[in-house]
């Protein structure tokens, strides 16, 4: 059963649009990590996201792929940048 890893991003004060696009580009580049089926990331276009300005959806082969994805060095590096520049909220569910 596939797993959806959803992430909501809210930039910290002073983080501009160029930095957010750089972050989204780095997230989209994680498709090489084993277990990843697809990655989508973009800017929110509504006022219904509780302050989040950007979102990410990562589709993984299964819930068993999540630990490897989260612990992969490339994901860790992107995660460090995310936490430096954004407030992050994540949710995972099987589909």
List where the protein language model places each region.
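Short S/T/G/P-rich N-terminal loop/turn motif that feeds into the first structured element of a domain
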Residues: 1-53, 61-71, 94-95
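A common structural junction motif
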Residues: 28-33, 74-80, 85-86
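Conserved catalytic core of Hanks-type protein kinase domains
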Residues: 59-60, 81
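Charge-dense polyanion-binding interfaces
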Residues: 83-95
